[in-house]
């Protein structure tokens, strides 16, 4: 049985957000780094640091905060894994779904790398739908 690294990072971020943790530590691979870059660029996370411990690299993510009058609280971050090792989901560029009318993003793995739904539509490429984030 294989390990699903994308589901692991989605679960880690979701659990940290629900437990009101400020930071998340995930293992660093090429796939996780490209997904984290997209999350940082789209504003879902605040900061990313690369940390080395015992010849292993980790990414330390700082989650974004919202301010309230009484106290600061975390944003409610919704992440959902779509394509998984047992059931791969593919889409062409015309049929890439829109999440909440364009408010959320879809992360795709294409022949040109991992990108958001907007970038894939502009480049007119389809691919495997990895996850939804809203």
Swiss-Prot record:
It comes from the Eukaryota. The lineage of its organism: Eukaryota, Viridiplantae, Streptophyta, Embryophyta, Tracheophyta. SUPFAM superfamilies: Ribosomal protein S8. Keywords: Chloroplast, Plastid, Ribonucleoprotein, Ribosomal protein, RNA-binding, rRNA-binding. It comes from Aethionema cordifolium. The keyword Methyltransferase does not apply. GO terms for molecular function: rRNA binding; structural constituent of ribosome. The gene is rps8. Part of the 30S ribosomal subunit. The keyword Plastid applies. This is Small ribosomal subunit protein uS8c. GO terms for biological process: translation. It is found in: Plastid, Chloroplast. It holds the Pfam family Ribosomal_S8. Belongs to the universal ribosomal protein uS8 family.
